[in-house]
Structures are given as structure tokens and as C-alpha cells.
């Protein structure tokens, strides 16, 4: 990014701190800020992943999606359910940043007080409020995985599949051990 002339600003320890600072910079300098997940147009674009999955595997039973703020999961779950309501969408979060699980259990957008995960791409304290109704309607289940499971999944993907996947993307791989998918067609979205 710097090579294109942009000034890179690293701020805070979790997404929520960086996002608040980005809004301040946008206001101060007149920048345009496009939220990376709490934006229905961004989430709609991410829904194209569901189209690709269903095109390649029309009989898919489960789609596992990593969750930070919920944009990717909103897009994938909403479009998947629109195209085939029988598809089960499983959201997967780090145990140390389970803001969607907390919010779904509370029935409203909830902020978790502490983040503790190696999955920094999903280290979000609060899911997107614009997205939450779609997540409530379209996510069938939430699984949380801990950092040790992510580490084992990283090693498995590297050693057995020759793929290097960052920790947020590995959430769905680690989650495979949590449910019995025998005889089912399952897609794990590797994205963070």
C-alpha cells in the first residue's frame, strides 16, 4: 500500500479501536470511509461467494463461514438461504472474540469486553448493527474455536494440504471437528 503512495496508520489493538480512529481521520480530513463489514453493499458483494459455492456444488448441505464483524457471513448466509433455504449456514468465531454468539444469545447487538485471540482478522468486539437482523435470520448455528485448535489447523493445512491460511481463515477448518458432518456435503470458506 505504501508503494502506491498511501500513508498506512496502525492504531489500537483490536478492530473497534482502529475503526473509531479511522472515522476520526475521515471527519478531520474529509476522507471517504467505507466500512469493511457494517455496510450492506459490501456484504452483498461478499454474497457472491455463496453463488460460486452453489454453482460448483448445488447439493451443498452446510457452509461454514468465519466471522469477525459479520459482513462476509451476512452476504454468504443471506444469498445461500435465498437460493436454497435448506442450506445450513454455520458461523465460526474465535472463542476469544465471540461477539456474534454473544449477540445472538442476547437477542441484540452486544459488545464483548475483552478480545483474546490469535485470529486478528476476526478480533472484533461488536458485530455490525446494520447486519445483525440478517445474521439472526440466516445463521443456523455459531461455533467457537480456541487458539490451540487454530494452531493445529494451521499445521494440518500446511503439512497435509500444502496451504498457508491465516488464522481467521482457519476458523472454519478448526470447526469441522465440532459437528458430525458424516454423509453431508460441507464447504469451509477460507477467508479472514
Question: In which residue ranges do the predicted regions lie?
Answer:
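PLP-dependent amino-acid enzyme catalytic core
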Residues: 1-191
Amino acid at each position: 500500500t505504501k508503494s502506491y503512495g498511501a500513508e498506512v496508520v496502525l492504531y489500537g489493538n483490536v478492530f473497534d479501536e482502529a475503526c473509531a480512529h479511522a472515522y476520526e481521520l475521515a471527519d478531520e480530513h474529509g476522507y471517504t470511509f467505507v466500512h469493511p463489514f457494517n455496510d450492506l453493499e459490501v456484504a452483498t458483494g461478499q454474497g457472491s461467494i455463496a453463488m460460486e459455492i452453489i454453482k460448483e456444488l448445488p447439493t451443498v448441505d452446510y457452509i461454514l463461514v468465519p466471522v469477525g464483524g459479520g459482513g462476509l457471513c451476512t452476504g454468504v448466509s443471506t444469498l445461500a438461504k435465498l437460493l436454497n433455504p435448506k442450506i445450513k449456514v454455520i458461523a465460526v468465531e474465535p472463542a476469544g472474540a465471540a461477539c456474534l454468539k454473544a449477540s445472538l444469545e442476547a437477542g441484540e447487538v452486544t459488545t464483548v469486553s475483552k478480545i483474546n485471540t490469535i485470529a486478528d482478522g476476526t478480533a472484533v468486539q461488536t458485530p455490525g448493527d446494520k447486519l445483525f437482523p440478517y445474521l439472526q435470520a440466516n445463521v443456523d448455528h455459531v461455533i467457537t474455536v480456541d487458539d490451540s485448535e487454530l494452531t493445529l489447523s494451521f499445521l494440518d493445512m500446511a503439512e497435509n494440504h500444502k496451504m498457508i491460511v491465516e488464522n481467521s481463515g482457519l476458523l472454519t477448518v478448526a470447526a469441522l471437528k465440532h459437528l458430525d458432518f458424516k454423509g453431508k456435503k460441507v464447504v469451509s470458506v477460507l477467508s479472514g
